[in-house]
């Protein structure tokens, strides 16, 4: 009946996804009833149960597959994050349709709200100060009549007011609608997407995005941006306001931000930030850091943290990370529990505190620097220094203390289970020129989409 079209496949699998546990209960009830009815019959032998067991396993497997496809967005393999259109093609051929909507707006700085259950959203500024929507509809149905009916039901609904407009795409199973929108540049956009990518470029009024399954890409924005992620990558480039990202996801790439950059949540891919004029905040279950001014770049993955050219006071608290920091000016407070810590300072110098529970600590100071230092490591590890300082070994602990030059800044170094090393380095001054002295970026930095490659990358 499914293959002949007498029973709608979408309706059947939606029903089965919801009610398959009741079928199992019903099957169990029938078997129990049969057992009691045959209990008084001595000639009834033991029936083989292999077929029943395999039937139960098949029902559970089909129920799990149907329910997963129903919960993550009906038939998400067909209209999911990677646009795999083949899995559910047996439901019927793909039908496509385009809808154009032009809407006048009374406000010069409207509030635009967009709700899309499945599909991508792309927003750019309009040239006439009005709103223009192009909706590309995609459905899998066995007949043209069904597809035409769905196209009409899927037409975006636009509700206008004196403050702006609300654009809503109806939620229909096994469908997808991609929106390409042009809105007034000064509009404040609020976008909610359940399954699909969100791209915004050139807005000056600000944007807030909530995306459950999909990537978010923002570029050339002249106001604040806030994204709530669940699954997917986030990128923002050339942002004049704040950039705030929270939730869970994969890669995060943020570059050329004039305001604050804040990442709060569990992101399991690579984290890349570069040239942030405001304060950088990052918080997860494994890493907590704050950098008042990131002149260079920051790279973070599951095992490494690299920071290049940053102005303090820098604060880093990490677990199970190898930390590599270069050209760090001002105060720095660093804690690590399972990994090596390597820091090279730059002028203007500040107080430096490093505590590492398990791992080596290496600090490089300019050879002409003035500072006082206290440091300690366990007795079975090594302490090495290029400076004329006092070292002792008492009660299973090695210590390092003394002053260089006229004292100056204070250093406090602890390596609970690891080597401690204080090195001489060349003098360096942190330039606040965001283009950098040599054009280099931190290792592993992934340039934002659309950025021109360097000579080395070419």
Q: Where are these predicted regions, by residue range?
A:
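Extracytosolic and intramembrane catalytic regions of membrane-associated proteins
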Residues: 122-124, 128-161, 165-166
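Envelope-exposed proteins and targeting segments
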Residues: 101, 108-112, 117, 127-133, ...
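Right-handed parallel beta-helix
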Residues: 189-248, 253
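Short, surface-exposed interaction patches in beta-rich subdomains
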Residues: 97, 101, 150, 170-172, ...
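Alpha-helical transmembrane segments and their membrane-interface anchoring/capping motifs
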Residues: 1-140, 171-178, 182, 186-188, ...
């Amino acid at each position: 009946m499914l293959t002949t079209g007498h029973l709608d496949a979408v309706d059947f699998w939606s029903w089965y996804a919801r009610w398959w546990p009741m079928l199992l209960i019903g099957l169990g009830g029938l078997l129990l009833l049969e057992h009691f009815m045959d209990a008084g019959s001595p000639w009834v032998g033991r029936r083989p149960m292999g077929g029943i067991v395999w039937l139960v396993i098949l029902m559970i497997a089909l129920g799990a597959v149907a329910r997963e496809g129903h919960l993550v967005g009906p038939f998400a393999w067909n209209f999911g994050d990677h646009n795999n259109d083949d899995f559910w093609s047996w439901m019927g051929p793909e039908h496509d349709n385009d809808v154009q909507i032009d809407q006048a707006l009374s406000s010069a700085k409207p509030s635009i709200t967009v709700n899309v259950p499945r599909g991508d959203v792309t927003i750019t500024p309009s040239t006439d100060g009005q709103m223009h929507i192009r909706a590309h509809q995609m459905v899998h149905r066995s007949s043209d009549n069904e597809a035409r009916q769905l196209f009409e039901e899927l037409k975006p609904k636009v509700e206008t007011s004196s403050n702006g407009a609300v654009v809503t795409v109806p939620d229909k199973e096994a469908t997808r609608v991609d929106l390409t929108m042009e809105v007034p540049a000064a509009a404040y956009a609020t976008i909610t997407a359940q399954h699909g990518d969100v791209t915004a470029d050139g807005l000056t009024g600000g944007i807030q995005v909530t995306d459950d399954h999909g990537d978010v890409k923002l570029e050339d924005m002249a106001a604040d941006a806030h994204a709530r992620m669940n699954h997917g990558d986030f990128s923002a480039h050339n942002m004049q306001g704040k950039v705030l990202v929270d939730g869970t996801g994969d890669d995060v790439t943020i570059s050329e931000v004039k305001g604050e950059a804040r990442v709060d949540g569990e992101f399991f891919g690579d984290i890349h930030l570069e040239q942030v004029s405001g304060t950088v905040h990052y918080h997860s279950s494994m890493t907590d850091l704050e950098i008042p001014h990131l002149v260079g770049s920051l790279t973070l993955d599951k095992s490494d943290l690299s920071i290049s050219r940053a102005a303090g006071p820098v604060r880093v608290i990490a677990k199970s990370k190898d930390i590599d920091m270069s050209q760090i000016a001002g105060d720095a407070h660093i804690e690590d529990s399972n990994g090596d810590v390597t820091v090279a300072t730059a002028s203007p110098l500040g107080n430096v505190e490093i505590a590492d529970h398990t791992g080596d600590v290496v600090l490089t100071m300019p050879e002409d620097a003035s500072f006082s230092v206290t440091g300690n490591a366990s007795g079975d590890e090594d302490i090495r220094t290029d400076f004329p300082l006092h070292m002792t070994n008492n009660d299973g602990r090695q210590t390092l203390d003394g002053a260089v030059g006229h004292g100056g800044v204070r250093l406090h170094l602890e390596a609970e289970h690891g080597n401690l090393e204080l090195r001489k380095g060349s003098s360096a001054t942190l330039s606040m020129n965001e283009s950098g002295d040599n054009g280099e970026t931190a290792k592993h930095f992934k340039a934002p989409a659309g950025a021109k490659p360097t000579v080395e990358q070419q």
